[in-house]
């Protein structure tokens, strides 16, 4: 994962009062933190937007991932963390043409 994306996502969680350690190269850590703090994040994501600078692909991906997280929360995290990670990784690979 691009360091800039990881930094933005960690800031998003931090802004919501959630301390999470991005200790994997995929998005498992993110979806685990989201699921563990669903109510707190649901309220936070309704009131905030994140701007990135520079790279259009990064901006596109981060805002798309935010929308996916919001939808997942609206569905009461019905899909597993693993399924959400697979979705995010698939889209990440398509956009950035990177294989893990």
What do these predicted ranges mean?
Residues 1-100:
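Alpha-helical bundle regulatory/interaction domains
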């Amino acid at each position: 994962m691009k360091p800039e994306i990881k930094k933005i996502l960690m800031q998003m969680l931090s802004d919501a009062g959630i301390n999470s350690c991005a200790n994997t190269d995929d998005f498992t850590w993110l979806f685990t933190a989201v699921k563990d703090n669903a109510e707190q994040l649901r309220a936070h994501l309704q009131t905030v937007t994140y701007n990135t600078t520079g790279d259009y692909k990064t901006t596109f991906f981060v805002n798309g991932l935010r929308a996916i997280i919001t939808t997942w929360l609206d569905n009461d995290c019905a899909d597993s963390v693993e399924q959400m990670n697979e979705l995010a990784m698939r889209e990440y690979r398509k956009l950035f043409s990177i294989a893990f």
